[in-house]
Amino acid sequence: MLKNAPYKFSEFESMSIQYGNCDSLVNKYDSKTGDYQYLNRADSLVKMKLHLSKDDLLYLHRKAADLGFWDFPVDETGDSVKAGAKQPVRYIIEFKYQRKSKKVVFDTNFDGDIRLIDANLGVIKEINQVLNKVEGDQKK
């Protein structure tokens, strides 16, 4: 099955995630450059270089495959003008490979299949866990 997968890790180039309010995606990570920035609990912008190992990237590649990321719709945005709606958090996740790439835009107020929403949240959770682990290891 893995040999016929449309996205092969041997062709992997980079992974990136951006998230925040729809008008300002201030939280960002790019595995190609190692640029990582996020708002901490004190609302201060933290910037650093954070390089993921090949094993970390392989783990994320496999988790994305397990959760069905390659089959996610490209546009999973919610209704941002709904009366009384809280502004959603927008996530832009992209995996780049030599021959193709997959980019998904997901809003937390996306009104789709609950399984798809859970799968998106699963990919986001896995990426954040890896980033937090590597950042914690780097501080030691």
Which residues does each predicted region cover?
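A mature extracytoplasmic/lumenal domain signature
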Residues: 42, 56, 64, 97-99, ...
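A short, sequence-level motif marking secondary-structure junctions
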Residues: 33, 52-55, 106-113
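N-terminal export/targeting and maturation segments
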Residues: 1-54
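Short, well-ordered, aromatic-rich surface patches in folded extracellular/luminal domains
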Residues: 1-19, 77-140
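Mature extracytoplasmic domains of secretory-pathway proteins
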Residues: 47-82
